[in-house]
Every structure is written in C-alpha cells, then in structure tokens.
C-alpha cells in the first residue's frame, strides 16, 4: 500500500496538498509515482504564474509515459522546486519531501477543504 501522510489533503488526480499558513505546497502522491515508473523529467510553471483548479500546471515524464499535473487549487505560484530540473528522480525517491513541486497562494482557500483526506484517497485508489 502506498505511503499516505495523514496531515496532507489529496486530489482525484493524485496530487497532494500541504497547508502552510496562507500557502499550499503541492506534489504528486506515492501512488502516482509508482504507477508512472522512473521519472526522467519534470516540467513546472514559473513563479508568478496563475494556476486553475483541475487544470494542468505542468507535467512529469517517465520512461513509460508523459502525465499532466493538475492543480488541486487555483492561485498564484510563489515558489517552484528547481531541484527537480536536475533531480527528477526525487519524485520516485521522496514524493512528499524532496519532490514537492510548487507552492501556491490560493485564491479560494475553501478549495483546500474540498480535497480528500488520506483515508478517502486510500479508498479511491483501492478501487483503481
């Protein structure tokens, strides 16, 4: 079973969200990285870009496929993990720590509340 930290929120598109004050840190779940296989490239937005909930904000490329990343919340990108440019394997090795992808200042904080808990996400992936 995938590693699912309880303090995080989860989206149907397999992104995780960590609330940090008035900002949220976003990455992909352990389940997602294991489904994708070895990650070889990560494409992310620029600081200052706006992201829309349920719309693509970047992509991850694995040896098997290219998969779009979907924003779990709308808002402005205030930080991007540039470490992933040179170390895309962090997504496989440490999806919740080293491989966070972007930090967003949400335009609507209630979107975070609509995301799934770890238990709800676990139930969803067990049905896939």
From Swiss-Prot:
Lipoyl-binding domain location: 23-105
Cofactor (UniProt): (R)-lipoate
Keyword line: Lipoyl
Cofactor note text: Binds 1 lipoyl cofactor covalently.
PROSITE patterns on file: BIOTINYL_LIPOYL, LIPOYL
Keyword Manganese: no
Modification N6-lipoyllysine, positions: 64
CDD domains with a match to the protein in the record: GCS_H (cd06848)
InterPro entries xrefs: 2-oxoA_DH_lipoyl-BS (IPR003016), Biotin_lipoyl (IPR000089), GCV_H (IPR002930), GCV_H/Fam206 (IPR033753), GCV_H_sub (IPR017453), Single_hybrid_motif (IPR011053)
Listed GO biological process terms: glycine decarboxylation via glycine cleavage system
Listed GO CC annotations: cytosol; glycine cleavage complex
Pfam families assigned: GCV_H
Function: The glycine cleavage system catalyzes the degradation of glycine. The H protein shuttles the methylamine group of glycine from the P protein to the T protein.
Subunit structure: The glycine cleavage system is composed of four proteins: P, T, L and H.
Cited PANTHER family: GLYCINE CLEAVAGE SYSTEM H PROTEIN (PTHR11715), GLYCINE CLEAVAGE SYSTEM H PROTEIN-RELATED (PTHR11715:SF3)
Homology family: Belongs to the GcvH family.
Protein name as annotated: Glycine cleavage system H protein
Organism the protein comes from: Halalkalibacterium halodurans (strain ATCC BAA-125 / DSM 18197 / FERM 7344 / JCM 9153 / C-125) (Bacillus halodurans)
Gene expressing this chain: gcvH
């Amino acid at each position: 079973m995938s590693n699912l930290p309880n303090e995080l929120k989860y989206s149907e598109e397999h992104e995780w969200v960590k609330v940090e004050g008035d900002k949220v840190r976003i990455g992909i779940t352990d389940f997602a990285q294991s489904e994708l296989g070895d990650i070889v490239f990560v494409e992310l937005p620029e600081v200052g870009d706006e992201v829309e909930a349920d719309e693509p904000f970047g992509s991850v490329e694995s040896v098997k496929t290219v998969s779009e990343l979907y924003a779990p919340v709308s808002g402005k990108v205030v930080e991007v993990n540039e470490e992933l440019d040179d170390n895309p394997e962090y997504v496989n090795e440490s999806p919740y720590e080293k491989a966070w992808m972007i930090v967003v200042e949400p335009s609507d904080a209630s979107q975070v509340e609509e995301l799934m808990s770890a238990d709800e996400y676990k139930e969803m992936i067990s049905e896939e």
